[in-house]
Amino acid sequence: MERSGKRILRLHTADPVAFGFQPPESLLLDVHRSLADSPGYCHPQGLTPARRAIVQHYRSIGVPRVDIDNVYVGNGASELIFMATQAVLEDGDEVLVPLPSHPLWTGAITMAGGTPVPYQCDEQAGWQPDLVDLARKVTPRTKALLVINPNNPTGAVYDRTTLLGLAEAARRHRLVLFTDEVHDKILFDDAAHIPLATLAPDLLCFTFNGLSKAYRVGGFRAGWLLLTGPLRRTTPFAEALNALAALRGCPNVPAQHAIAPALGSSGGSAMALPGGRLAEQRDLAWQVLNDVGMRCVKPRGALYVFASHRRTEARIADDRRLALDLLRQEHILVAPGSDFGWPAPDRLRLVTLASSDTLTDAVIRTSRFLEEYQQ
């Protein structure tokens, strides 16, 4: 379509740079100055200065027992998610995943031979995990529990009580914790992010983060994994991760020089404050969606809205076809709810990074399209 001259509004993926958000100039300068030192391979787990900066960061926010030997830098958090699931899971193992959940995780779990088992998140409670439903989903095959906080696609930020409940569920059933915290600096209103590892020092916890969202350098592919917990439990998984890290050679060296300066800055947190661009566009997207009847919970973090269009559900059987038809007719690209495991064809995820005028136009056009649409 673009080759034929059509302009596509891409509201399906959260690349801040594509919407005019620029990374901190000081971060780019640090990387540029380090290029002459970057042509060679580095340690399979990453550069020591980058890993030291990660250790210092997590110690400063209260994560106990942070050891540089259990820090892994990767080509984005995505690579490390695949490595971790390969290291932890055996064929037939089950992983409890939030519903809705990011497809990267369900894909990585499946590729590692595991089975994603969704636990419900309660829309009426701001998409907080339903701990009762989670308890029902535990079986003898359950190996791990995935927490995505702030959540993609819902924008939920989990409160302390919920996180303590999740940690207790993992403790009771001796589960490995996977915690995806890549949006931890993009918070709105009075939302506060609590690292799950601070509440579960006695549990084996894999914490994932990176520079793509808050620091607007997704193309750098710079992410990290922190492994915490009792030494007797971390050792076998660290050995597996070490082997996988060695197999890939090493992570991208130039981008690692961005990690230390990034962790010493505020990232995208200022833009998420009231009056900041991220906050204004979150407010606008939520307001316009509700004004046109596409109900959604107001996100408290991250870069997305997970909107309902239930008034048209009776006329829709396939939400992926809906998304494709919206693209063909209106040239608006969004992600259907089924991409996130949502069972009904009544949800769309939109990225809130576009300008205010563009977001308003996109939501109004999508609403008009849905009024007449049927399959």
Task: List where the protein language model places each region.
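Active-site phosphate-binding strand-loop segment of PLP-dependent enzymes
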Residues: 117, 122-193
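Conserved glycine-rich beta-strand-loop-beta hairpin in the small C-terminal domain of fold type I
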Residues: 260, 276-286, 296-310, 344
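Helix C-cap/helix->beta junction micro-motif
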Residues: 4, 112, 172-173, 203, ...
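PLP-dependent enzyme catalytic core of the Aspartate aminotransferase-like
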Residues: 60, 315-318, 325-334, 340-375
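Conserved PLP-anchoring active-site segment centered on the Schiff-base-forming lysine
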Residues: 87-109
